Structures are given as C-alpha cells and as structure tokens.
Amino acid sequence: MPKKSMEILTESMFYVLMALMKETMCGMEIAGFIEKRTNGRVRIGPATLYTVLGKFLKEEYIRETEVEGRKRTYAITAKGIQAYREETQRLLCCLRDAEEEDRERSIVHE
C-alpha cells in the first residue's frame, strides 16, 4: 500500500512543527528556533523552509495568522499537532528499537 505523502516527516518538517508547538512564528523565527534548538546541527535554508511551510499550509498542518507585507506568521493546527505527536512516537519507537538492538548485540559480543 503506498504511503500518504505526509505520513513520515523529514527532519526539517519535524523541527518546523516543533517550533510552532512553542508559539506562532514567522519564517525567520522558525529557522532561528531550529538552529538554536539543535545547537546548529540543523540549519534550514529559506528554500527548504518555505517549501515545507507551503506543504504544511496545503495539508492544513499550519495556518497563516498574520500577513504584514512579505512577513507571514504561522500557527500549528490540530492536524499539525496530531502529526507532530505521531512522528514523535514513531521516532521514540525507532530509538527504543535501536537501544534494544544495541543491548542484544553487546550481550552476543561479550
């Protein structure tokens, strides 16, 4: 069965939703949040950011709350919150699987 386009979020998508879970933000604030939250490990450029925002608007994961000239402010929707929480759970399951695999591997190699 083919997966829905937004079923699994990319790292950039995940962090954009994380930023908007905190508060409404404009694009530059989102990029700044991501860079600060990840200690510079993830830097999202304007092209990627606005592509993600466009997809999220289309899928109704976010909505525009304010438009001042070219500056747009975004807020997460209930659908976006659900997607963020589902992705968080998926990632936690991946981490648990990796930890269990590491434990099993260390037992075998002892």
Feature annotation, model-predicted:
Residues 1-8, 94, 100-101:
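Intrinsically disordered, low-complexity serine/threonine- and proline-rich regulatory segments
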Residues 6-48:
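N-terminal helix-turn-helix DNA-binding core of bacterial DNA-binding proteins
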Residues 18-19, 82, 93:
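Surface-exposed charged/polar residues within alpha-helices that form helix-capping/stabilizing sites
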Residues 49-56:
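Basic amphipathic alpha-helical segments that dock to polyanions
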Residues 57-69, 75:
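Beta-hairpin "wing" of winged helix-turn-helix
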Residues 69-88:
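Basic, amphipathic "hinge/linker" alpha-helix immediately C-terminal to the N-terminal HTH DNA-binding motif
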Residues 85-110:
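Amphipathic alpha-helical dimerization/coiled-coil segments
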